[in-house]
Amino acid sequence: MRYYEIVLIIHPDSDNQIDNLVNYYSEIIINSTGKIHRLENWGRRQLAYAIKNLNKAYYLLLNIEISKNILDILDNDFRFNEIILRYLIMRTKNIIVDPSAMVKKKDDNNQEGNNSTVCI
């Protein structure tokens, strides 16, 4: 089993489908004896450049441990899923479970009185 970090950029009009998407991919990973070490929903954010005439999208970050053949299945599924605008799969050398800089930044904002929430 290898460790991977996956970032998904999801269509902004599919906010009600994000939970279903996360559950679907979580089931695939867990049923294949894989593990999800970190799952972060960064929320709806401004894109650096327009993708399919969209300026905002939802971001999801996953750190998982799976085998190569299951990664190929996920890669194929990401490619043909219409609500996933872009995705990035990176192999990592070890498990990453610490909160990302995006979550830390939002936590700092929460402590300053901002009421934005993070779903992990």
Swiss-Prot record:
HAMAP family in the record: Ribosomal_bS6
Lineage of source species: Bacteria, Pseudomonadati, Pseudomonadota, Gammaproteobacteria, Enterobacterales
GO cellular component: cytosolic small ribosomal subunit
Entry similarity comment: Belongs to the bacterial ribosomal protein bS6 family.
This protein's name: Small ribosomal subunit protein bS6
A matching Pfam family: Ribosomal_S6
Biological process (GO), any one: translation
Organism: Blochmanniella floridana
GO molecular function, one term: structural constituent of ribosome
Keyword Transcription regulation: no
